[in-house]
Amino acid sequence: MSKKKVLILSDHALSTSGVGTQTRHLITGLLEKSDNWTFRQFGAALKHSDYRTVIVNEDFIIKPIDGFGDRESLRIALATEKPDVLLIFTDPRFFIWLFEMEDEVHQICPIAWWHVWDNYPFPDYNKPLYQATDAINCHSYLTYEMVSEHFPNKTKFIPHSIPKNVFYPLEESETLNYKKQILGSDREDHFVGIWVNRNAKRKRPNDVLLSWKNFLDQLKIKHGHRKATLILHTDPNDSEGPNLLVTAEMLGIQDTIFFSRDRLEFDKMNILYNISDFCLNISYAEGFGLSTLECMQAGSPIIALKTGGLTRQVVDHRDGTENGVAIDVACKSLVGSQQVPYIYEDYAKCEDVADAIFKLYSMNKTERSELSKKVKDYVDSEFAYKSTIDLWDESLTELCANWKENYERWECKTY
């Protein structure tokens, strides 16, 4: 049987972005599963340092591009590569040009989409995009609930997942040694949190620092010390966000903050997750929240707002228990723009975040150990890498076999 060729438009699969790493895991997993697939990717970024084609292997080839491509480059790829599937994976606003030429794409192949939408209400303004797509695989359950209600026959839930050998618990002695190496021996007994996000408004970085200050105040009042460190894996000087160095100094917490500024490989990130007692995410709009899943796979609990894709991570949907602390939404704001006319933003109170941190701090060693096992078991069950790969294999196989029967071509009738 000849291999089916998939043309992917997403972040460069060898980049460190969430979309990039998930693209890499997906391609690698499908190639390891069977010999049925071969992949070509337009690897997106704002700018690349090297535009030479990357041949990972004969079935995994990446062409770096600025942005997510354009009509002409896609037309050339469709004509020369003749893919069996076009797979897109990122915010739909980057692909409006593609949806406008979906009739040209469908002369060659179907369109699959690994999709996420951050929040309610259902985006009626996206209906033309959904109608133009042949398979909508949602990586957050909230997105699946919204879209499947309107397009049940082509919508599936296929969550993000990570190979087990990427993030995993380290031995306790090894973790302690890394903790002393990275944070210093003077912080050996510190309670450690980690925040892994871009320093941008949506991620609420200043509110993270304010929440941390509130926690430290509680710690000082109730225990007489501030033996705690928050790792911020971000650029404190990112132009998209506030100057976190100045904010930390204003709040008087600069001595409790540790900035991890460099892009790190998986093994280094695994160490950071292991030396952390929890991972925090309070973004007001979060489609999935990959860092919290990564941290849970390393055995550390999370503190997360019950919004978007975070809800199914922080709350065990099977019994309602929490994989750390789930924070209730304190305020919903209906916002919008010309391209996205309406969508909710969800906000947590900084006081609730501080209380959540203190709740985890107050657990004894046995309780923390049990929680660590719980979060690791939950990831292994509900975000299993093998399951994600199997579901994608089934979805793409079914799509290649049946898409022409289900595709409704537009017809222009004149009278």
What are these regions (language model features)?
Residues 168-186:
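A short helix/loop element that forms part of the nucleotide-sugar donor recognition site in Leloir-type
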Residues 142, 161:
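Carbohydrate-associated surface elements
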Residues 8, 186-203, 209-212:
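Conserved donor-binding/catalytic core segment of Leloir-type glycosyltransferases
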Residues 1-50, 81:
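N-terminal subdomain of nucleotide-sugar transferases
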Residues 284:
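Aromatic "clamp/platform" in nucleotide-sugar-dependent glycosyltransferases that forms part
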Residues 301-304, 314-315, 322-326:
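Short hydrophobic beta-strand element within catalytic cores of glycosyltransferases
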Residues 241-263:
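Nucleotide-activated donor-binding/catalytic signature segment of Leloir-type glycosyltransferases, i.e.
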Residues 336-346, 350-415:
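C-terminal amphipathic helix plus adjacent low-complexity
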